[in-house]
């Protein structure tokens, strides 16, 4: 599945064989240097000092008239943060995230978006063997609260400052010259996250794993693992257990 409307808006023009090659992880766009991102995170109240992209790689950035976007593959194979995982994804969750993220976009909710969903032709071992897939997604950024936590928990404060400077330049350049721009960054991130969760609640969306490793600095919805929509209002409903 190739999201041609999104590709057009990003100025991406590829032949069919290039789509299959690049977005399956079998080939790389010119000048691409893939990286897996490192981060920590509070998961359901417990701090985990080392997480990172276990099955995702960032291919690079796309500059458009509307700003800069990350281009990321999910399910393309092992990274240095895979731990005991295989770095792969089953095709079902890939298609599910494709549909959900596009639905959220058209519902007016800030979100990562799906550019392509590719069947790999391989099988991945889960409870049973399932068809494998790779998702290509874009987002304004994959910087997470957990990215800051990784360095802060190690007292690497110069790295925290560098990360904050990058986040300001990328997402909030209008605050660069303010006297307390780091405090203003915190306020902007908190405000955008509050607005995001409010939009979720307005449409009955439950993320299911809203931990700091899934909390973007840009205020976008990412990682559609156990998420669901409420069919009927039930304030105690959960989808993460």
Task: Give names to the regions the model predicted.
Residues 187, 195, 239-241:
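Internal nucleotide-binding/catalytic subdomain
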Residues 4-20, 24-180, 191, 195-196, ...:
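Conserved ATP-binding subdomain of kinase catalytic cores across diverse folds
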Residues 91, 198, 203-205:
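Hydrophobic/aromatic side chains embedded in well-ordered alpha-helices
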Residues 159, 181-192, 202, 206-207:
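Short, contiguous, pocket-lining structural segments
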């Amino acid at each position: 599945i190739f999201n041609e409307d999104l590709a057009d808006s990003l100025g991406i023009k590829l032949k069919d064989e290039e789509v299959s090659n690049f977005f399956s992880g079998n080939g790389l766009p010119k000048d691409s240097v893939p990286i897996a991102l490192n981060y920590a995170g509070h998961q359901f109240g417990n701090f985990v000092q080392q997480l990172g992209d276990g099955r995702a790689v960032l291919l690079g950035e796309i500059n458009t008239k509307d700003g800069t976007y990350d281009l990321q593959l999910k399910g393309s194979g092992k990274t240095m943060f895979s731990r005991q995982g295989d770095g792969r994804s089953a095709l079902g969750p890939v298609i599910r995230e494709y549909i959900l993220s596009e639905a959220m976009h058209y519902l007016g909710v800030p979100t990562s978006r799906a550019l392509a969903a590719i069947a790999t032709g391989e099988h991945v071992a889960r409870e049973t063997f399932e068809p494998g897939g790779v998702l290509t997604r874009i987002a304004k950024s994959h910087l997470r609260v957990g990215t800051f936590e990784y360095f802060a928990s190690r007292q690497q404060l110069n790295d925290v400052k560098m990360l904050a400077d990058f986040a300001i330049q990328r997402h909030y350049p209008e605050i660069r010259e303010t006297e307390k721009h780091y405090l203003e960054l915190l306020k902007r991130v908190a405000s955008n996250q509050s607005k995001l969760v409010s939009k979720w609640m307005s449409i009955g969306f439950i993320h299911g794993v809203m931990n700091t490793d899934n909390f973007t600095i840009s205020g976008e919805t990412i990682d559609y693992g156990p998420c669901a929509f409420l069919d009927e209002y039930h304030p105690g409903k959960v989808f993460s257990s």
